[in-house]
């Protein structure tokens, strides 16, 4: 499975926790996850994710528009293949599958990292893994769903850092 992350920055080249080396490593982690867990249809040989960095004001606007929640958040995901019930339902016969968009606010990620006693890089990897899991149908509205999602994202973060 080949995973490609297309990166964009709405902040005009502001400082970022993210770098090209991280992109390659997270693509591998996501590819490994897909190979092991098989969440995509058999026909899918590659997948694509759009990753965009937004400033706090931009993220607050997006959060308000789509979640009706005030203020910025660390990560938002917009799944391409979510059906009306919220389940992941991609086309079964596509060999290349765009999964959707992940929008990250590095400033909020850095604040959360400091509050949680983590490195900014570790927190960035965590929110991107979290966003990816939303793209393939995971949610955390219920405790059981939350536990399953958190276990997977923590496993992916550990793989990223070689733990």
What would you call each of these model-derived segments?
Residues 1-125, 133-163:
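An acidic/histidine-cluster motif and surrounding catalytic segment
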């Amino acid at each position: 499975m080949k995973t490609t992350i297309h990166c964009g920055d709405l902040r005009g080249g502001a400082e970022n926790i993210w770098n090209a080396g991280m992109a390659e490593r997270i693509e591998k982690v996501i590819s490994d996850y897909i190979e092991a867990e098989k969440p995509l249809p058999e026909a899918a040989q590659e997948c694509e994710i759009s990753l965009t960095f937004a400033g706090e004001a931009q993220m607050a606007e997006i959060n308000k528009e789509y979640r009706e929640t005030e203020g910025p958040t660390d990560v938002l995901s917009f799944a391409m293949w979510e059906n009306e019930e919220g389940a992941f339902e991609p086309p079964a016969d596509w060999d290349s599958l765009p999964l959707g968009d992940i929008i990250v606010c590095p400033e909020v990620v850095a604040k959360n990292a400091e509050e949680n006693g983590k490195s900014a890089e570790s927190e960035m990897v965590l929110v991107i893994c979290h966003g990816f899991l939303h793209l393939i149908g995971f949610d955390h509205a219920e405790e059981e769903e939350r536990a399953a999602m958190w276990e997977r994202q923590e496993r992916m973060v550990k793989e990223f850092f070689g733990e």
